[in-house]
Every structure is written in structure tokens, then in C-alpha cells.
Design a protein with these regions (language model features):
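Membrane-helix entry/capping segments
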Residues: 1-20, 51-53, 66, 110, ...
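Glycine-centered tight turns that cap/initiate beta-strands
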Residues: 19, 88-92, 170
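Residue-level recognition of transmembrane alpha-helices
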Residues: 24-27, 180, 281, 300
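Alpha-helical transmembrane segments
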Residues: 30-59, 298-301
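Short amphipathic beta-strand/extended segments in non-transmembrane regions
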Residues: 60-63, 77-139
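Mid-to-C-terminal secondary-structure elements
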Residues: 115-141, 150-276
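Interfacial "coupling" helices/loops that link adjacent transmembrane helices in transporter permeases
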Residues: 289-309
Length: 309
């Protein structure tokens, strides 16, 4: 049967059984819509592209203390330095304050409240994403920071560069004010760059000197493992070094243990099993809808046959 013939048959069916056509259309529409939506969610979560270099080697490093009910505790500055100096599993570790901090950015077209994300010297470079303009932080930036007691340079987002600074080509080296203090732009990150997937509104990343607060637990540690190193090996070494640092401070390690998680898992957990189950359940609903529509069409066909007898 041609497409034109199918259309004529559909119109005849619509005139004869308008209620059936509406119910069948709604049933199939809801089933297909729900299945498509759930598939999109599963696909997005399972295949979310972080955009980082060698993301399979990227991890987040926590400390846990089960005896104190602590499941995720950021490592101290001392532990991070000990891992980089004495360890053999981490290529780099960067620290960043997730969540950002509200500040006032002025000196552009107009003053506005924005979010900054404090980072250490490796906080941006650890993910392996090159800036669109300029550079990210270098050790000498932090030497100046220690002398001046405050950050003097910032790396801005592409959105901030375009929307708040007019996309000026000579933005590198320009000075603006953050909460009334002068700051110099040293880099612009690429469009769409996010250190954390759910933080879309970070205006810039600001240098922070953690050496002044060596035992602070306010940052999240993102690490890059050396090639060939497994998560289990990194976790074992991090546990040993964390306990050694605590003992050197005179603290009792107790049940302290490192927890090293692949970055994608740390950000999104393990939702695949649950989402796949939900996708299967929704697909089953679509199957039921198709069966119901088929039964309604068969019943309508049988009724039409009886009337023609």
C-alpha cells in the first residue's frame, strides 16, 4: 500500500473511530516521549564529556575516617605536598574551592556581582586544558602572592571576557577591580570550560596561597595519575602518606584511609545501573502502549467486519 493509501485509510479510521485514534495517538506519544527522554538522560550522564586531557587518569582524592563518621574529607595541604614529593603515583594534584565565592567585579562596563573560584598553582593546569588567551598560573605567581599577601592575577572565563569585558583582544594584562582591589588578567579559558560540570557561572579563577594555612581542609583535590598507575595503587599510597603526615604532627591516624575516585565517578556517582533500570521500565511501558493500540485496532477491525456481515 502506498503512502497516499495509508493516509486515506487513516482518515477513514479517524472519521469512523475518532476516540480510538485520539487514545492511540496519546498512548504512543506518551510512550515514545518518555522512552526518548529517559534515553537522553542515560546517554548524557553515561557519556558526559568533561573535556579534560586524559580524563581516564583524572581522580578526586579524599580522606575518610570511619571511626569519626567522616566519609569525604579534603586532604590537608601537608598531605598533598607529601604525596607530590615522596609519592610515585600522582603526576600532579590541583586544589580548588568548589562552589565559588561571591565578589564584586568592577572596572569594566559596569560593576557586577560574580562568582570566583579560588585555586592553587595546579588548580587549572592539572586538567590539561590550555587557555584560549594568555596562560594559567605559574609557581612565580604564588611567590608574588606570598610576598604581597593577596592575589594580584586572575584567569577569566570565556563568558566573562565576552559579556562583561566586551571581548577585547588586548585583555591580557588589563587590570580590573575585585572587591575594590586591583587584579590583572593573565589568561582567558576556552568557551564552555568548567572545572566542575555543574558550576556554569564562575567568572574567574583566583590564586590562593595554601601554605599559610597548611592544615586547612577547604579545598577539593583533583589529581592526575601517572601513566599505568591504577586507582587502587594510588589509594594505597595516599593512605600510607596521609597516616605518616598525621603521625608526624602528633595526631592519631585511627581509621584514616584515603579514598581515590575516578573523576567521572566522583562527579556523577554510579547512576548507570539505576538509570538503565528506569530506561527498561519506561521501554516496557512503551511496549504495553503498543500492545494496547494493537488490541484497539484489532477490536475496531473486528467490529467493522461484523457490521459488514
Amino acid at each position: 500500500m502506498s503512502v497516499l493509501g495509508d493516509l486515506r485509510y487513516a482518515l477513514r479510521l479517524w472519521k469512523r473511530y475518532p476516540t480510538l485514534v485520539v487514545v492511540a495517538g496519546l498512548s504512543l506519544g506518551l510512550g515514545v516521549g518518555a522512552t526518548t527522554t529517559m534515553y537522553s538522560v542515560v546517554n548524557r550522564v553515561s557519556h558526559y564529556e568533561l573535556g579534560f586531557k586524559d580524563v581516564d587518569r583524572m581522580v578526586i582524592f579524599w580522606n575518610t575516617q570511619p571511626d569519626k563518621g567522616i566519609d569525604r574529607q579534603p586532604p590537608t595541604w601537608e598531605v598533598v605536598q607529601a604525596l607530590l614529593k615522596n609519592g610515585s603515583t600522582f603526576e600532579a594534584i590541583g586544589l580548588a574551592q568548589f562552589g565559588g565565592a561571591p565578589v564584586t567585579l568592577s572596572g569594566a562596563a559596569e560593576s557586577s556581582r560574580v562568582l570566583q573560584m579560588p585555586v592553587d598553582v595546579n588548580g587549572l593546569s592539572v586538567v590539561g586544558v590550555s587557555p584560549l588567551l594568555g596562560r594559567t598560573y605559574l609557581p612565580e605567581d604564588f611567590e608574588d602572592l606570598i610576598k604581597q599577601k593577596e592575589a594580584r592575577s586572575i584567569v577569566i572565563s570565556h563568558e566573562t571576557w565576552q559579556r562583561r569585558l566586551g571581548g577585547m583582544e588586548d585583555v591580557i594584562g588589563k587590570s580590573f577591580h575585585v572587591d575594590g582591589e586591583p587584579r590583572t588578567v593573565i589568561g582567558v579559558m576556552p568557551r564552555g570550560f568548567k572545572l566542575v560540570p555543574w558550576e556554569d557561572h564562575i567568572a574567574f579563577w583566583a590564586a590562593n596561597d595554601l601554605s599559610r594555612i597548611p592544615q586547612a581542609r577547604w579545598m577539593v583535590a583533583m589529581g592526575r595519575l601517572k601513566p599505568g598507575v591504577t586507582v587502587a595503587a594510588a589509594e594505597a599510597e595516599a593512605t600510607t602518606i596521609s597516616r605518616q603526615v598525621m603521625e608526624a604532627r602528633g595526631d592519631k591516624p585511627g581509621t584514616t584511609k584515603a579514598r581515590v575516585e575516578p573523576l567521572h565517578q566522583a562527579f556523577f556517582g554510579r547512576p548507570e545501573d539505576v538509570l538503565t533500570f528506569l530506561l527498561g521500565a519506561v521501554s516496557f511501558v512503551l511496549l504495553i502502549a503498543c500492545a494496547n493500540v494493537a488490541n484497539m485496532l484489532l477490536a475496531a477491525g473486528a467490529a467493522g467486519s461484523c457490521r459488514s456481515c
